[in-house]
Curated annotation (Swiss-Prot):
NAD(+) binds at residues 34-38, 83-84, 117, 140, 177, 293, 317. The active site is at residue 119. Pfam families: BRCT, DNA_ligase_aden, DNA_ligase_OB, DNA_ligase_ZBD, HHH_2, HHH_5, Nlig-Ia. Its EC number is 6.5.1.2. The gene is ligA. One of its GO terms (biological process) is DNA replication. One of its GO terms (cellular component) is cytosol. DNA ligase that catalyzes the formation of phosphodiester linkages between 5'-phosphoryl and 3'-hydroxyl groups in double-stranded DNA using NAD as a coenzyme and as the energy source for the reaction. It is essential for DNA replication and repair of damaged DNA. It catalyses: NAD(+) + (deoxyribonucleotide)n-3'-hydroxyl + 5'-phospho-(deoxyribonucleotide)m = (deoxyribonucleotide)n+m + AMP + beta-nicotinamide D-nucleotide. Residues 591-671 form the BRCT domain. This is DNA ligase.
Amino acid sequence: MDRNAAERRIAELRAEIRRHDHLYYVLDRPELTDAEYDALYRELLKLEEEHPELVTPDSPSRRVGGAPLEKFKQVTHRIPMLSLENAFTDGDIAEFDARVKRALALPAGEEIAYVCEPKLDGLAVELVYEYGTLTVGSTRGDGVVGENVTQNLKTVKSIPLRLEGENPPELLEVRGEVFLPLAAFQRLNAQREEEGEPPFANPRNAAAGSLRQLDSRITARRPLTMFCYAPGEIRGADFGSQGEFLSALRQRGLPVTSLARQVTGVAGVLAYYREMTEKRDTLPYEIDGVVVKVDSFPLQRELGEKSRSPRWAVAVKFPPRQAVTVIEDIVPSVGRTGVITPTANLRPVEVSGVTVSRATLHNWEEMERKDIRIGDTVVIERAGDVIPAVVKVLTEKRSGSERFLPIPAACPECGSEVVKIPDEVAVRCMGLSCPAQIRESIIHFASRNAMDMEGLGEKYIEQLLRLGLVGNVADLYTLTRDDFMKFDRMGEKLAENLLNAIEASKKRELSRFIFALGIRHVGEHTAKLLATAFGSIDNLARATEAELLSIREIGPQVAQSITTFFHNEGNRETIRRMVEAGVEPTVEEKKVGGKFTGKTFVFTGTLIRFSRSEAQKMVESEGGHAAGSVSKKTDYVVAGDEAGSKLDKARQLGVTVLAEDEFLQMLEGEQ
């Protein structure tokens, strides 16, 4: 390919990859399979390698991270990034509203239009776009001077390296919050504990630690994301309000929360605050309050700023999700990789409406650092679905009877040697036949998100182990009706159901089978990538590290873990036995020419005949796409009982709304 043809093709590939990055990471509406995306990305890398003079700073290939820096350079913000004044009560909100009205000399009875947004618990940053290209990214710092973290921010997939649309502004400074979703935070901490590294205390610390890496390649491996919420300096564009500004950011491809809303007066703010309080635990990321801003930019300018905070905005904080209780005992437990984790048994206490009786202590180094002892009075914190953690010891409450739990000399489950690996914080059982590791690996294999052996839970698996009927996961496929009838209080019907569940698991999707194997560092998402890329367990078992590294989102650590797993003779024998028993994982392919091909569905509310995930699979099996949010490109919204904001948005956008029965008629070909 000559240079001119290469230049044209590179431009096409970059535009296409940017479009699909935006669809995947911002809109949650992927149109390509991972394999199709990877093919585009590899073609771009190959062409840029052949024509290095055509590489540009805004190319998607620049997201991978570069050589480590010695230190971050400083960046002075053109307009200071101010902090917000806090409010905690209904009275505080009313007082803020009254101050705004007094400052604007509004007549009695006139209400202010506010924009309310969730207050994200992450790291504040500023993005600078010059003529549409991201040139500088920096942290807030002290509000006047921050750190230049441009290379790291370029690895965040939801941040466009180039703005969408024609005629971008000469200068657009955008402020926002970089954060780590809760599910990603849990995966990251689980991975760190397996690797013997100290876990992050909370998602905010994880986001800050990830973004402030001197080696941007480490940042690139962390699934950070961002929501934009405020302007800095702007030249070449003009906005009249916060609502108009957020709308313009969306049109330019920048990530903006879908929960921002214009409200009127104190009543509107309070209603929004209560709504977010209720939604807080259902969100996939951590929020710690609500930000309230005067919507009108002219009114914001009239109100002005104090030395450290604007007069036109306030942060309404949620009550803390903490409680004080007593550690009644500390119990070591063994995971499926042999890591021994201390867990605190607590005097039951209610935190944010949930009764908490256990808290993770992570590892012995963390216990020593916090000086946590049995009998201590402690402060615990619960965040979303994250396991509660001890955040502080109230040493002033000690009586002298408290005692520290030392690292066990032997595995509490099998008595094998316990080793603390150098440069790791993890303590591991070295027993190859440790019953706790075997138990946890079988529980994981049979679990709902893995092989989904319905009914075969922890209680029955422990009985199988106690009776010596299973020694690893392959033994599950050798069980008979007579084996189950040896259980306490086991009926023939239940035994038959368990055998049917095991039999049904033989045809599970390949991605589930890969996840079920318990390969270190391979979660559900990575398992799906591997299933798409290799198509069979045999192909994956033969894959080289180089082949694995060619897959988007697979790094050296994961690749090495996968090859190590399949090079192990015992693991290969286990898989061979399962295949001989009839385990035949399937690869789901979208139906070509299905009745929903090219159509996007969104499900909201409670469905009667099936779960939402089952309905989404039905759509995908007919060639359609099941999205998580409503947009102008949504074709149908299927509304069940108690449908919420998605139904309202569908009506606003004129999207066709279907009842559950109407969706079934379409599925069965009656419409």
